From Swiss-Prot:
Its EC number is 2.5.1.141. It is found in: Cell inner membrane. GO terms for cellular component: plasma membrane. The keyword Transferase applies. It is a multi-pass membrane protein. HAMAP family: CyoE_CtaB. This is Protoheme IX farnesyltransferase. Belongs to the UbiA prenyltransferase family. Protoheme IX farnesyltransferase subfamily. InterPro entries: Protohaem_IX_farnesylTrfase, UbiA_prenyltransferase, UbiA_prenylTrfase_CS, UbiA_sf. It comes from Opitutus terrae (strain DSM 11246 / JCM 15787 / PB90-1). Carbon 2 of the heme B porphyrin ring is defined according to the Fischer nomenclature. One of its GO terms (biological process) is heme O biosynthetic process.
Length: 295
């Protein structure tokens, strides 16, 4: 652990605390929900949505690191985070996180839509009050976290339409099922780190990796089926349907290769990168379809 005084924290240290790259995923999926709802063009509302979701995601990231700074200090992957590295004081991280979360809720409620604020509140509480503590005691922590991570499209959809219709809930399902193989691949790769801090997640408990791989495959298959529902329900054209089918089958193939014991470690990395490629491709196709192709 670094001995750098937290009182010397720089702006870059606080920015790192908000995990801007990871927070961008929440912002982008909220934008997908907003654009897929096809509301009347309102650049001010769109900018406020981005600002509100950015603040919420950054605040949650800061508070999560405040809650987990003890375990972060004992894992190689997280030991360099601002709090365990001594760059930011725990009290400062707490204050920053609380202010960002409260500010985001106020902004979204007053200037965007109350339902968007409600889904943001659900995101904050499900992540910090359910997922973060569950990592210490539950094998199902990944799935609990996937619930929290699937709310941003609903934030965007409710901001655009004032309610959530069928396609919005499909987006929730897509984000949920996508996260399971994504984080299973990460957790399998870093299972020794998680074992060192006694997180009882499936990749720690399943030494062979057979159940990890099977569970990843099941959720990837569920993702493929869920992603095709908009086409089956007449909510998109074949442009999106083909994109969802091709990318979904490619993702599924990587999950199948993860089932092979001899190459499981290498396959986990490939599954991770496949998940990174899958999401922007399928969500980008959905936005293009909804904005320009659906009558």
């Amino acid at each position: 652990m670094s001995t750098t005084p937290a009182s010397n924290a720089k702006f870059s240290d606080y920015l790192e605390l908000t995990k801007p790259r990871l927070s961008m995923l929440s912002v982008m999926t909220a934008l997908v929900g907003y654009l897929a709802a096809r509301p009347p063009w309102d650049p001010i509302q769109l900018a406020l949505l981005v600002l509100g979701t950015s603040a919420a995601a950054g605040g949650v990231a800061a508070l999560n690191q405040w809650l987990e700074h003890d375990t972060d200090a004992h894992m190689k992957r997280t030991a360099d985070r601002p709090i365990p590295a001594g760059k930011v004081a725990t009290g400062s991280a707490f204050v920053l996180g609380v202010l960002m979360c409260i500010g985001s809720l106020f902004l979204l409620y007053a200037l965007v839509h109350p339902l968007a604020a409600l889904f943001t509140l659900l995101t904050i509480f499900s992540y910090l009050g359910w997922y973060t503590p569950a990592k210490r005691w539950s094998r199902w922590s990944t799935e609990i976290g996937a619930v929290a991570g699937a709310f941003p499209p609903l934030i965007g959809w409710s901001a655009g339409e004032g309610r959530v219709t069928a396609l919005g809930w499909v987006l929730f399902g897509v984000l949920f099922f996508w996260q399971v193989p994504h984080f299973m691949a990460v957790a399998w790769t870093y299972r020794k780190d998680y074992s060192a801090v006694h997180f009882p997640m499936l990749p720690v408990r399943d030494e062979s990796g057979e159940r990890v791989a099977l569970w990843s495959l099941i959720n990837t298959a569920a993702l493929l089926v869920t992603s095709l529902l908009p086409l089956l329900w007449g909510l998109t054209t074949w442009f999106y349907g083909v994109a969802a089918a091709v990318t979904g089958l490619w993702f599924l193939w990587q999950a199948i290769k993860f089932m092979q014991p001899a190459t499981r470690d290498r396959a986990a990395r490939k599954l991770f990168f496949a998940s990174i490629g899958y999401l922007p491709l399928v969500l980008g196709a959905l936005v293009i379809d909804r904005l320009f192709l659906v009558s």
